[in-house]
């Protein structure tokens, strides 16, 4: 695989992550926002589809780290590996957060008429919400800043993109911290506003990688031929 195709692959993985995460949230969002929804008009298809899309999002996260590693490691091995690990950690938390959504199906189908299920429902939703704070907020903030820093140093993409990533990553981490301590609500205007920069970072990075690819000058400085094959990927596997 050439470096151009590597960039396209990374861009596709980024597009997959944010499309699947947004559509997934739309699918199961009503269940998280309406306490009685599960007992009245829950749609099994919506929950299963939303959970599936969250898993796709998690796999896309891992894909971005693996796709970028062979190139980014030329600038910093430790930061490149750190990004892979952090993206994998974020993906793991997302997958764990899917489990309580699926458990809501059992609650509705088998225990809907049982006393005390409202408390169980609230606990399952809280489990999912806290996983969203830890993964797509706190861990995402750190891995965003990790990649943005190494991209800024390497010059592999337009300078404004890593600058946006550094700012957006710090802001979403700060937002997650405020949510964790109850200073702001998880679903609020403040939270949405603070998520805009990191959302813009992912769209900008994905678009640049897919349509333009890595900057040839930066690749040359890092000693990466534009026709280099990702035969370097086995080095990742042997780590």
Predicted regions mapped to residue ranges:
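Hydrophobic, aromatic-enriched alpha-helical segments typical of multi-pass transmembrane helices
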Residues: 1-239
